[in-house]
């Protein structure tokens, strides 16, 4: 079996986008908007990005049942059984657990990348290469891999990954700590330390 045959992607598209109100609303959250005027919504851009490196039938979309029609409208080529509709919102962990359980029934030793539907990636070729490098790494290691970028400003809307040691760009390191959405004071300390991604 080729490596690409065991690579899967889960795109999380169930958020309500409340931080970007009034443009992003509960009825039409940011992942379903053409945020940057490209002619493609954030969800479509994320799907397109992963479709270049992962087989289309290996891409799952997790969304709230209220957004299932929007997903089908924006991604008509995605098979119905690849759109997982949550009856209620329970944040990230249950969404990831459900999707990876579905994938494990199809491919018990699959490599899975989980991505939000609403991220901005400016250097897509570098991103693609890093994702492929990460999938190759987990394919030969018994581990979880999280990818991060150096913060450019303190932000309370993101998690912060602390590496065990300083590392060069594109390298792998063990995670020392992870802090989910810290208070602004901590986010500032994390950013200024240079140890966090």
Language model segments and positions:
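Conserved N-terminal catalytic core of the sugar/cofactor nucleotidyltransferase
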Residues: 1-11, 22-26, 37-116, 122-125, ...
